[in-house]
Amino acid sequence: MRVEICIAKEKITKMPNGAVDALKEELTRRISKRYDDVEVIVKATSNDGLSVTRTADKDSAKTFVQETLKDTWESADEWFVR
């Protein structure tokens, strides 16, 4: 499965150093518990977005990734060490 998370450039510039890499690592760890062969890409773009590809169950996978992203973002104080 390939997960591509697009974060608006103006938001990325406000994130602490290392936050993008830490987010990628944490999402990979969490999503890998349910799906094998996960590739997570976090990149700066003009708009926020999420795409999930290379999986047979796209709808349920995207729902799972959206929930996981939300939980991960909301619990950043627990896993992100500056």
Swiss-Prot record:
Which keywords does the record carry?
Answer: DNA damage, DNA repair
- One Pfam match, given by its short name, reads DinI
The record, for InterPro entries, names: DinI-like_sf, DNA_damage-inducible_DinI-like
GO terms in the biological process aspect are: DNA repair; SOS response
Family assignment from sequence similarity = Belongs to the DinI family.
Protein name from the UniProt record: DinI-like protein Z3305/ECs2939 in prophage CP-933V
Q: Which organism is it from?
A: Escherichia coli O157:H7
